[in-house]
Regions:
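HhH-family (HhH-GPD) DNA N-glycosylase catalytic core used in base-excision repair
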Residues: 1-198
Length: 198
């Protein structure tokens, strides 16, 4: 299967995906609004192309008011109706409701973990299977593929970039969660951990 890095080497004209690959994909995120936004985009992509989601990324950001968790968690039926009428985003009621419910679930994590980022950090490292079970218990609309891509794209699982990709080295210098995990892993175990997240 072709990796994202290989795809972009073969398709240099795809500037939309290149921008995301070079400046966002795999980079660690540090605040709950950014994490909720990324989770939302992964949920929105289910059954659709990632390119379509990238084309609508800014519209999502505006429609959900920057993904400020408390604002989204407070959305009611009028907000749902507004979102379902917004042609700039993916107008799927299940997905829209999932964003709002997940914002409320993030609020619920604050008492014990302080934030969504704190919750992720408290459970890292886990295998992909363990992460998926945990997400399904904690959030809604979070199947295995959504969880995998969310964790890859936010620096909790490796393999967002090929090791020979220049962006891989750039991200590794930022010490995302997966890189800290590898640093603390005996060399004999690193190949499996790096090649097979989960």
């Amino acid at each position: 299967m072709t990796s994202y890095c290989e795809y972009l080497q073969d398709h240099p004209e795809d500037t939309l995906n290149k921008l995301y690959h070079d400046s966002e994909y795999g980079f660690p995120l540090t605040n709950d609004a950014a994490l909720l936004e990324r989770l939302t985009l992964e949920i929105a992509q289910a059954g659709l192309s990632w390119t379509l989601i990238l084309k609508r990324k800014e519209a999502f950001h505006q429609a959900f008011e920057g993904f400020e968790v408390d604002s989204v968690a407070a959305y009611g039926e009028k907000d749902v109706a507004r979102l379902l009428a917004d042609s700039g985003i993916i107008r799927n009621r299940l997905k829209v409701n999932a964003v709002i419910e997940n914002a409320r679930r993030i609020q619920g994590l604050r008492g014990e973990y302080g934030s969504f980022k704190g919750w992720l950090g408290a459970h890292h490292p886990l295998s992909l299977e363990e992460w998926t079970r945990l997400f399904k218990r904690t959030f809604v609309f979070t199947g295995g593929e959504i969880v995998k891509e969310f964790l890859r794209s936010t620096g909790y699982l490796p393999d967002a970039h090929d090791p020979d990709c220049p962006v891989y080295k750039q991200i590794a210098r930022l010490e995302p969660a997966w890189a800290r995990d590898l640093r603390n892993t005996p060399p004999t175990e690193r190949r499996d951990k790096a090649s097979h997240p989960g």
